[in-house]
Amino acid sequence: MVASTFADAFRFMPSHFSLLLEKAAQTAELAFAALAIALLIALPLGLWLGHRHRGLLLALSASSLGRSLPSVVLIGLGIAILGVGFWNNAMALVVLAIAPILTNTYFAVEGVDSDAVEAARGMGLTETQILTRVELPLGLPLLLAGLRIAAVFVIATATIAGIFGGGGLGDIMARQVTYGLGGVFAAAIWVAGLALLTAAALALAQRAASRRTAPRA
Amino acid sequence: MTGFRLADGGGPVIPNYGEPSACLRHNGWFCTDWIHEHWGDTLQPALIQHIQLTLIAVGIGFVIAFGLALVALRFGFLDPPLGVFTDFLYMIPSLALFQLLVPLSGLTVTTVEIALVSYTLFILYRNIVVGLRSVPPDVLESARGMGLTRRQTFLRVELPLAMPAILSGLRIAIVATISIATVAAFLIQDGLGAPIFDAIGTPDLFKTELLAAGGLAILLALTADLLLAFAQRALTPWNRLR
């Protein structure tokens, strides 16, 4: 039974290649739009709070709250407020992505060795310079780790949108009657692939960033 | 897959209960009369089912993850493949995993539990391994020097020192499971996902049921998170500052 589903999935991939590609593009569009909006909100806030060493409670409760919001509930509320479509799903995903980005950014900047920050301050660097030249480079690995967690989580959760007519690879997963179990499995493999590719891209970015900052540090 | 429950009054129109209130007729956001009327037959049972789903999944997941972690610590070469295996389980989207298990175990709670357990493994396994491994070697050395047996060292030194990581893993796993368990209603009428899916599936989207059941799911997760945060503090008094 399992083996035949596996075989079906690998037959489904070439026969429905253009469908999978189209749906994967929809999932990627939705996930990346949500991530971009979440970054715009959470990154400046996390950097600022971390730099000022304020808002520990906010950072901690953001992560608790973010974890506690079931995606099904958020997407349902999105539909109730905005109707079925791209933006209600994007809104739900933005809310989910903010938590890990905000918390990790906060702890990335807040956790930078205070001796390094004091030394920079003693050398006459302004607060902005301290943030961009000392705290950001040193905190970058943790910050990017948060982004990676958020990205993988958002891509996997974007499929839930398919249940409620949100399109994307979740659309195939929610319609076993049409595409068969092989199709469901094929779509799942593509989602995992998309998540892996994104995580790998962010890991590469992380390595490139740390190489660029290394001589200065 | 989740049928509409018209017979037992799951929708906004309740023909057998007399006139619906103005709030229900306008599909209001929070019609207290509906909540009063359906607390006993819809919301409370769903909440209890949800708690059961979560506790069983995390309980079984914890036992398996603990066993795997002990194996990985004893035979170090097994750690990378076990880590990759639990990672892989976590990457299968829940919507797909629930369906993929149906041919094996049918449209049952067992199917849902297997999927939920497999998601907890990723979080719990990592945290238990990291926690047990973070015990400094000189601490182990001095425990041995004090004449503790291997078993005593594990129970009195390694386990307490690994407790913060294990508890934070449990906390994340429980909250995540509460969230993922709502997706289970795509398969079977069980847990808080059932009224949530019903509400979304109702023509016009039944807002009161969505908000009541969804609110309960969020409250349950927040309560669990808070309780475990207190447990973390109580059980690791030496770790208060963080």
Task: Tell me the role of every PLM-derived stretch.
Chain B
Residues V63-L68, T111-L140, M163, L170-I178, ...:
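Membrane-embedded alpha-helices of multi-pass transport/permease systems
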